[in-house]
Amino acid sequence: MAITRRHPPLLLLFLAVAAAATATIAGASQSTRPRPAVSPAAAADFVRRSCRATRYPQVCERSLMPQAPAVGRSPRLLAQAALTVGADRARSCSGYLGGGGSSSSSKRSGGGGRGGAVGDCADTLRDAEERLRQSAAEMSRMGRSGSPRFAWRLSNVQTWASAALTDASTCLDSLATYAAPGVDVDALRKRVVAVSQATSNALALVNNLDPHHHL
């Protein structure tokens, strides 16, 4: 006597497929769901409170408050914005130093230009800008907080931002005893200090993303 194979009812098969499709759609909607709207006052307060954890809180507030609407209350977006601010300042400063940061009369006399300590400093700050932009880009690829990928990428950002801060410090050291006719050395140093402070603040905000940093 032949044995008849029993096939699952068509209805059950349909329900299984429908359930799988529903789960897939739900997961996709959660991953693409926009962040809840944050009021301007709440976003500004978040920036203000977050900046208290930095070494230069007033500098932090002034530079990041314009980013508050885009940041909302996201520590990750705030750190990313701070890295971009640091990179922009490094680019501006390296361009200024690359021109010698001197008056036209001193350039004609050979006091300006990219030679010596100023030129080395400009090159160093270009390295700092590259590291900070690389760090900001890495922040976009970090993934879910607490995951191995997050920890790995966060470690990269911490390493690169720390190196950028070292670059700024090296530049300041090279200008400590620098002097040239017609060159406003104080103006040079102030610009480099601005880079150093912005980078220090960015690194502090990045470190706040590390759960081990609070232990």
Give a label for each model feature.
Residues 2-3, 28-215:
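Folded extracytoplasmic luminal domains of secretory or organellar precursors
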